[in-house]
Design a protein with these regions (language model features):
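Mobile cap/lid helix-loop segments that border enzyme active or cofactor-binding sites
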Residues: 1-56, 94
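Short, thiol/selenol-centered motifs that function as redox-active sites or metal-ligating centers
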Residues: 65-89, 100, 133
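Alpha-helical scaffold segments that form or flank carboxylate-/histidine-based iron centers
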Residues: 25-34, 59-74
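Conserved small/polar residues in nucleotide/adenosyl-binding loops
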Residues: 143-145
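Acidic/His metal-coordination segments adjacent to aromatic residues that form catalytic metal sites
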Residues: 102-112
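Ferredoxin-type iron-sulfur electron-transfer modules in oxidoreductases and energy-metabolism complexes
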Residues: 95-101, 139
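Amphipathic, charged-and-aliphatic alpha-helical interface segments
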Residues: 66-69, 114-133
Length: 145
């Protein structure tokens, strides 16, 4: 992986586009440093899912749902990246700690109600039991969004 100091103009541009809200470049993206076009493709997919202007969910909630999916998948690397972003976007240490522990304990109902809880439950079902997803699950999620 190439550092910022070793980057040529094309890579510097790709790295700048890949920076998190707190200014770092996650290793999952930096690994593309030898092929900046693959980094750009990775970022295009990521941003279209989580940080697109047409998304109606707040960014903190998108990152929190991503964190919960990371927990459900037992993926610590993904959790560290998504949770760092969620925590930054929540901007309330006490609230973010409470949310984090409720998700780690797989009890989102301890922090969420209504739409937010429905989305957490949908994400859990889609992650752990995708074959159990019914049309009503998808329709319900669309109503809330």
């Amino acid at each position: 992986m190439l550092s910022d100091e070793m980057a040529d103009t094309e890579l510097k541009q790709a790295l700048d586009e890949a920076r998190t809200p707190h200014g770092t470049v996650d290793n999952v993206l930096r690994v593309h440093s030898l092929r900046p076009n693959t980094m750009k493709g990775h970022m295009a997919l990521y941003k279209s899912c989580l940080h697109d202007d047409t998304n109606t969910l707040p960014e903190w909630l998108q990152e929190t749902i991503s964190s919960y999916v990371s927990i459900l998948n037992s993926c610590e690397y993904s959790l560290l990246n998504h949770w760092k972003n969620a925590e930054f976007l929540i901007r309330d240490k006490e609230k973010s700690n409470k949310i984090y522990f409720s998700l780690k304990n797989r009890k989102p109902q301890d922090c969420f109600t209504g739409l937010e809880l429905a989305l957490m439950q949908y994400a859990e079902k889609l992650t752990l039991r995708p074959s159990d997803i019914k049309r009503a699950d998808v329709d319900l999620s669309l109503i809330h969004i």
